[in-house]
Amino acid sequence: MNSKHGDQPYDFYEETRKYPRVHINLPITIYLDNKRYITASIYDISPDGLQVRCTRATAEALNPRGQRIKYEDNIVVNTKFTVPIDDEQHVVAVSCQIYYFVILPNVEGEDIAFGLKFKKFEGQSIRYIGDLIENELEPTIV
C-alpha cells in the first residue's frame, strides 16, 4: 500500500494527530458492558486519547461482527488502567469513543490497533494522564 498518507493503513491517523504521542506499554481493561470486558495493551497515549493493540481473538470480543468501526459509529466504552507516577500507581478510569480500528501488517502477536478518544474522566484521571505524559516527555538527566 502506497498512499499519499504513507505506507501503512494507519498512517493517516498518525499524521493527523493534534498532540504528540508517548509510547508506553501498559495493560488496559475495556468494559464491553457491566459483566464483560477485554484486556489489551496501551501502545501510546496523548492528552486526547490512546492507541490500544490486541490480538484478533481479543478484537473479536470488542467487534464480534468484524465490521469496520469508524468514529462516526459513536461506540463508547469504559476503560480502566494503572499509570506509574513518581513511584506510585494511580488508577485511571475514563469513557472513550472508538476512533478507528485497523489490522496491523507484519506485527507479531498484537495484530489489531484501535484508537480511543477520551470523553469523560472519573476522579483525578485527567491529572494522572497529564502527569504521566509530562514525566515521559521530560528529558532524563544522567
Which functions belong to the PLM regions below?
Residues M1-V142:
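Structured alpha-helical
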